[in-house]
Amino acid sequence: MSLLKERKPKKPHYIPRPPGKPFKYKCFQCPFTCNEKSHLFNHMKYGLCKNSITLVSEQDRVPKCSKPNSSDPKQTNQPDPVVKPTSSKPVPSGLSHLDAKLQHSLAKDDIKENLDLHARGPHRCLGQKPTPHKEAAPPSPAPEAAVGTQPVLEGAVRPSAFVPVGEHRLKGQELTETPEALALTHAPAKASSFHTKSAFHAPGYPWRAGSPFLTPEFPHKIPSTKGFGATSPYVHPSITEYPPHFYTEHGLATIYSPYLLAGNSPECDSPLLSVYGAQDQRHFLPHPGPIPKHLNPAPSTYDHYRFFQQYHSSLPIPYGFYRPESAFSSYGLRLPPVAGISRDQSSHLLEEAALGYQALSPSKLNSSNSHKKHTELEKQSPTPEAKEPSKDGQRDTEGTKMSPRAGSAATGSPGRPSPTNFTQTSQPCAGLCGLSDAPASSAPGRIPPPEQGLAAFKPIKKNTEHPHSQAPENRAVSPKSLEALSTDAPTQLGSLEAAPSSPEDGSRAAPLNLSTKPEAEPAATCSPAHGGFVEPQDAPLNLSVKDPCNALTSRPSVCSPPRGAEPAAAPTPSPTQQREPASSGDGPDPSSVEAPVPSPTGKAQDIRAADSDEQKQTAAVALCQLAAYSPGNVEPAAQEPTCRPDAPTPRAPESQEAQCDLRPKGQKRTSPREVGKGQQGSKKAKPSDTARVFTLRKRTRVS
């Protein structure tokens, strides 16, 4: 009968309202009252009431007791008086009364809820045992007094969240609850309560939370309930056992920290340990228990495999120490550090490799361009020297920065070798160095680069009127820029380009003021700009779409802006316009600047540009080398393009401005196309432009 009734409330989770007694049940913390506990139960269960489901489950025992009470309220009450002495007196009596309760269907409801509540329920029931005896008479005081009496009895103060309106029910329910709680408190009852509770709500956690409470509460409540005295030893052993497993597994926790952490271990002990074969481990763990962190990880590790469990006591020491070390170092320590280090190191190593490629690529390029070698060595070598230290710093910084970024596409390849690694090599060398030089101005840098390209061509404009007059100046600038390049490659890059930017402004303001003196001024401005703008715009130029090498190219371009102008100017003003818009599309892109030059100087530069393109060296490097190695060539080329860019100059500045401005956005691709148009005369420039465009893209990503 009790079982049937017990199951009935379990299935519907509500008890039919007691007959003839309106609002028999009251929510523990709410003014809600109802004849059907299910309403209040759901009220609390779903958090409508402040009582937690745990409290609800604890307190539902009593409502279920009331439930039987409603069916047999007097019968329940009868067992309750018996239960009072029983609960206060012998656990066996509590058990017998518990059986009676089960028969009375108090047991059915109580057990159902008690199982849920036994995590806290057992000790709370304990607290309630004396409390019900004391407070059974006053139903309403009982809950409050019970709460005050036992803080642990948050919900247990009132056996149920739903307090029966009648005192007799309160007494009977609480008392009956207590015996049931006592009975359930027994190991078997607890086990069932844990299972039921875990099924009902996460009881395992509250149970452990309650377990500590049970432990202290048991001493208090043991006198009132001997059953708990018996249970307390049970609980204590379980708790004490778990810490050893806990610690033992804790050793594993180091390896399997996500699974077994001190915080998780209490709950994880039984489930995880059972999973890990903790039972076998329990037997062996007590032995290695003192060494759990060292030995147990190995046994634990093996426990998963159930391999050395037999040998835990004997083998675990050598294997335990050895295996845990390897496991911890390789897994616990190495993997996270290795992951991070491998990322950082891999990024560093890749960056170093890139540096090696960078250093090697300039060297290779230098060796390949023996005549350019000295110039490039002057420029690149100091740049790698100056840049590599800064890049070393940056490598660490970017290694740190890039290691996370390395995974991201944006910075994906900055420090790493790539098919265009040499271009990137120049980029990392000059670009990273330049970035390190003026990382703060990187944002401005991107904007200046368009100016850079504009500047390169606008100096070309200035050169345009007086190509010859400025040609020497370009010469001077180019050697200066080369020297400055070798001196401050990244800085000079920015400064040269920056200087053109200022001349560019001047040329824009007065493109007609390209008289020799103004031209000289722009040229001089270019060289002074190298010194003056070097650092400020250095970074912006480096950050510009151009590679630092492109910046170098711009520098030669600035030094001999004619290159950009050369390609455009040499063929014809209209081709110049085409090319210059193309090159302006390319902006400073030295590749278009290099290749397009149809003039013999332009051709020579084109050849050299082709060489640099072939070597995937940034055209900037080749241009710098060309400018430094044969400033005369640059000069004639500069002069020729300087003369012709005049016509394109107006368009070139505009297109350059627009395209250079756009280039950081998306004109890079357009630049190669336009460059292709303008570079019809020289197709090799296209490859360099394309490579440069890629380089620029990569640089943009880097920046």
Curated annotation (Swiss-Prot):
Q: Spell out the Polar residues composition-biased ranges.
A: 67-78, 418-428
Tell me one GO molecular function of this protein.
zinc ion binding
Keywords in UniProt for this one? Activator, Differentiation, Metal-binding, Nucleus, Transcription, Transcription regulation, Zinc, Zinc-finger
Region annotation Disordered: residue ranges?
60-96, 121-147, 362-617, 633-703
Originating organism: Bos taurus (Bovine)
Which residues does the record give as Zn(2+) binding sites?
Answer: C27, C30, H43, C49
* Zn finger region (CCHC-type): 25-51
Q: What does this protein do?
A: Transcription factor involved in epidermis differentiation. Required for terminal epidermal differentiation: acts downstream of p63/TP63 and activates expression of late epidermal differentiation genes. Specifically binds to the promoter of KLF4 and promotes its expression.
> Which domain of life does the UniProt lineage start with?
Eukaryota
Task: Return the Low complexity bias intervals.
Answer: 79-93, 583-592
**What is the organism lineage in this UniProt record?**
Eukaryota, Metazoa, Chordata, Craniata, Vertebrata
Give yes or no: UniProt keyword Transcription regulation.
yes
- Pfam families cross-referenced by the UniProt entry: zf-C2H2_7
Q: Name one GO biological process term.
A: positive regulation of transcription by RNA polymerase II
Localization in the cell: Nucleus
Recorded hits in InterPro entries, A to Z, give:
ZNF750, ZNF750_Znf
Bias type Basic and acidic residues, positions: 375-399, 605-616
List the GO cellular component terms: nucleus
Q: What is this protein called?
A: Zinc finger protein 750
